[in-house]
Structure formats: C-alpha cells, structure tokens
Amino acid sequence: MRKPPNERLTGQPRTPAEAGGQVEEAGPQPSPGNDKHIPERKCILSGAHGARDDLIRLALGPDGQVAPDVRAKAPGRGAWIGVDRATLDTANEKGKLKGALARSFKSGAVSAPADLGAQIETALRRAVLDRLGLEARAGNLLSGAEKIEGAARKGDVHLLIHASDAGADGRSKLDQAWRMGGGEPQGLVFPEERAILSLALGRQNVVHVALIDRAAAARVRHALDRWRAFIGPNEGQIAATAGPPVASAVDGYEG
C-alpha cells in the first residue's frame, strides 16, 4: 500500500525496486547490522523515504539508460526506487518511470530498459545466493534438520530459513525448536526450492538453513527481505503452505 510522501518506509520486507527521487553519487555505505548511521533516500515513484540500504539504486549509464545497481557501488549518478516489481513494471509500461527519471536526472534523454524489473529481480536473487554462500564458507551457517534442531533448542540460531518445497512437518518441528530456544515464532520461507539452496551452498538436499552468527543473520535477512519485498513477500510460499506436505517423509534427513 502506498505511503504518504514524507512517511518512512516500514513494515514488511522492502522492495528492492522503488525509485529514489534523488540523484546522487554512489559512495561507501555501512553494512546491515552495524550501528552506523544509514542515510535515507526518496523513491522517485512513490515519494516515500526509506533507508538507503533498503531501496534500490538505478545507475545512469553513458548511453543514457539506467541499470540496476542493487549494491549501490556503481560510479556516477543514480536514482532510487522502493516499489515492488508489479508496481515498477506498470510504471515502466505506462511511461511513469520515464517521467520520474527525467525529473530526477533533469534530462528527458534518460530511459529504462523494458525488462528492468526482471533485471532487478535477477540481481537481488543473486545477491541472496552469494550472501548465503559467503556465510556458509565462513562457518556461520548450518544445514541439516538434526543439526539445526539441536542448535535452535540451545538458542544458537539467529535466523531460520525453509525452502519453499520443505515439508510441513519438518518446518513445524524446527519452528517449534527455534521458539523453545528463544527465537522467533517461525522461520522465513525462501522464495525458491531446495535445489536452488543446495546449489548456492554447494551441498546436497538443503531444505533448511540456520544462521548461527548474529551479524551474519542480519546480513542474510536484509538481502532476503529486499528480494522478497520486490517480488512480493508471499512469492514462493504457496508450495510451502498449500496442499499436502511436500517430502515430509525425508525432512529428518535433509542436508
């Protein structure tokens, strides 16, 4: 739901593709989970303000076309967006995005590719998979239902993630263990199936993932929230919540 122009974006995961109403030079920014001040930016489409780390930067190329810069590291000028993909695609199709870009960059020569929404979604997805891989290599991540259950009951799990095709029984069991260990009511549903989680981590049959380092959990949650917010927070959850449990018979042996 659209918020008033001067209201800060809050609530559910923020969508990575909302247009920021400001043009600025890219520069270093603090990482999620630390105590440093994070500047705000304004979405060029909705007019809502939000933390720079939560919005998506569009970098202006030499050809006058914008491209996704989800890590906000590209040099040169940029604009910011904070709407979901459906809103962005509609704005792009109807010319509203082009008008917003023209106002932000003060030039009518700026354009956006027709598949900008798809490009942003791909970039956000890649950012999540890369982050999971990095945390796994750093030893900050567990997979395997039995390992996760034990760590969760001891209070060592700071973020719990289920693949979209995880069985209902397995999810419920780990959610309960996490609650008993002082965690949240339930884990987050990953927007894709176990095959993608397994590929990202270089392991077989990864259905559940737990972050056992607080800072690592904050980094993964931030990347995952941005992706889920852009594609829609319920995207990928149908398989995990509707119909009979999926592969619940093997949940106890998930890697």
Specify the residue positions occupied by each region the protein language model found:
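Helix-rich interaction surfaces within compact, conserved domain-sized segments
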Residues: 189-242, 246
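Short helix-coil boundary/hinge micro-motifs
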Residues: 1-10, 42-45, 156, 172-186
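Electropositive, gly/pro-rich neighborhoods at or near active sites that engage anionic ligands
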Residues: 73, 95, 100, 104, ...
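Amphipathic alpha-helical transducer elements in NTP-driven molecular machines
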Residues: 36-43, 76, 142-145, 168-171, ...
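Compact, Lys/Arg-rich rRNA/RNP-binding cores from ribosome-related proteins
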Residues: 50-87, 151-156, 161-171, 175-177, ...
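Signal for well-folded cores of large energy- and translation-related assemblies
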Residues: 51, 125, 133-137, 152-153, ...
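N-terminal cysteine/histidine-rich coordination modules
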Residues: 1-100
